[in-house]
Amino acid sequence: MMNLLSSDGVQVLPRPFTLNERRREVRSFVLRQGHFTPAQKRAFDHYWPRFGVDFIGQLRDLDVLFGRSAPKVLEVGFGNGAALRFAAQHEPRYDYIGIEVYAPGVGRLLNGLAEDGSRHVRLYHYDAVEVLNKEIVDGALDEIRIYFPDPWHKKRHHKRRLIQPLFATLLVRKLRVGGCLHMATDWADYAEQMWDVLDATPGLVNRAGLRGQVPCPDWRVQTRFERRGQNLGHRVWNLLYDRV
């Protein structure tokens, strides 16, 4: 999942990262490549031109990108893509944008989207902060979904967590009024931090009331991170905020 860096010296790649001759300078996340299968590598070659969006650092007209006018949903840090693929299968009236730096997960989702014949999904293999700041117009998104971001469970690492005040303010800017932000975590203290940050962010109101949570929505499939957490005895918190 997406892992933002603070200014505390966490190591990043010092030079551009190249995958299938597409160069990207990694700036603001920890790159975790994992095991990259031949099938996932082939997916980049075969399906990236169909579903992939290369970062150019310029604001985009999302209706032009998708070739139609439809509600736009962004998932930040889609992991292996299970939730995004499920949503695209079951809610085809939406256009979906996914952002993920974990290359094997991107490759797996590319294969799945091709298998499904999906038409209205676009993927970034890049840093979410850069994409949001430089390529997404303010107010362009109807919904943002962030499922099971890295909890950085050690207290000294909490400042590396994705959900921080500046990032929350960025999300508010990109959501249209009337849109919503949906987050899920299986770490109690991260849920507390999410409430602390989001309740203090102008432009967001918790749909379930102060420090409230909602049942798992129909649009979110259970992820492997959720199953892992449940096996460890963790609860899952679903937080849903409206953009006002």
Swiss-Prot record:
The active site is at D150. GO terms for molecular function: tRNA (guanine(46)-N7)-methyltransferase activity. It catalyses: guanosine(46) in tRNA + S-adenosyl-L-methionine = N(7)-methylguanosine(46) in tRNA + S-adenosyl-L-homocysteine. S-adenosyl-L-methionine binds at E75, E100, D127, D150. Transmembrane segments: none annotated. Gene3D superfamilies: Vaccinia Virus protein VP39. InterPro entries: SAM-dependent_MTases_sf, tRNA_(Gua-N-7)_MeTrfase_Trmb, tRNA_methyltr_TrmB_bact. One of its GO terms (cellular component) is tRNA methyltransferase complex. The keyword Repeat does not apply. Keywords: Methyltransferase, S-adenosyl-L-methionine, Transferase, tRNA processing. The keyword Cytoplasm does not apply. Catalyzes the formation of N(7)-methylguanine at position 46 (m7G46) in tRNA. Belongs to the class I-like SAM-binding methyltransferase superfamily. TrmB family. This is tRNA (guanine-N(7)-)-methyltransferase. It comes from Xylella fastidiosa (strain M23).
